[in-house]
A protein has these predicted regions:
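An alpha-helical, amphipathic repeat domain used for nucleic-acid recognition
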Residues: 1-208
Length: 208
């Protein structure tokens, strides 16, 4: 059986290179070496080498997934798409998804709440537009409908969007402001009742 003849650190990485019978064989994380109690002189069967390679790949691609999640929360579909772009096998992708779900890093319900909160704070949009966005993220229709019903008030969001946008229309007269603001709110996916209320609120000052 092949024998470990050297374990050498990689440059600029918390990983080690494993040499079998004097030749480089594969790289593994320092943590995996500790877990598997690998040391120079150990004999490794081909089956053991394959298992180490599989565990190493899982750790390596999990680290990639964690980095992807570090920028912002992700939907399950977003993570699947990301892993597929990295040419990761279906079996390994399933293992990564399972681990991330168990660790609560992937949860479409939590993702939906986060997405709606971000939209409400920074870019208010109507239910139709939000529905389309969440569908693109791979969320199921029942989940989308439930979360939108619970979390979204079109009237409040349209009013918030209108108050923010009207500031950029200062140089226009009231008629032109109304035309532009109406067009903007419709493009943001708001229904007519919410649009009408927002127009009255910011232009006719019927609602403060």
């Amino acid at each position: 059986m092949p024998r470990i003849t050297a374990i050498k650190p990689q440059k600029k990485s918390n990983r080690r290179n494993i040499y079998l019978d004097g030749r480089f064989a594969f790289g593994v994380s320092t943590m995996l070496i500790v877990k598997e109690k690998l040391k120079v002189g150990d004999e490794l069967s081909l089956e053991k080498v394959k298992k180490l390679s599989d565990k190493n790949n899982l750790e390596k691609y999990l680290d990639m997934a964690y980095r992807y999640l570090s920028y912002r929360p992700r939907s399950i579909k977003e993570m699947v798409d990301y892993l597929q772009k990295k040419k990761i096998s279906t079996l390994l992708t399933e293992k990564i998804l399972l681990k991330l779900k168990k660790q609560r890093y992937l949860d479409d319900l939590k993702f939906a709440y986060w997405w709606l909160d971000q939209r409400a704070r920074f870019r208010p949009r109507g239910k139709f537009a939000l529905t389309m966005e969440l569908r693109e993220k791979g969320l199921k229709n029942d989940l989308i409908k439930s979360v939108l019903t619970e979390k979204v008030s079109e009237e409040e969001l349209s009013l918030k969007a209108a108050r923010k946008k009207i500031k950029s229309y200062r140089r226009f007269d009231k008629k032109e402001k109304k035309k532009k603001l109406k067009s903007f709110l419709v493009r943001q996916g708001f229904g007519w009742p919410a649009v009408k209320m927002a127009l009255e609120a910011v232009l006719d000052k019927k609602i403060i």
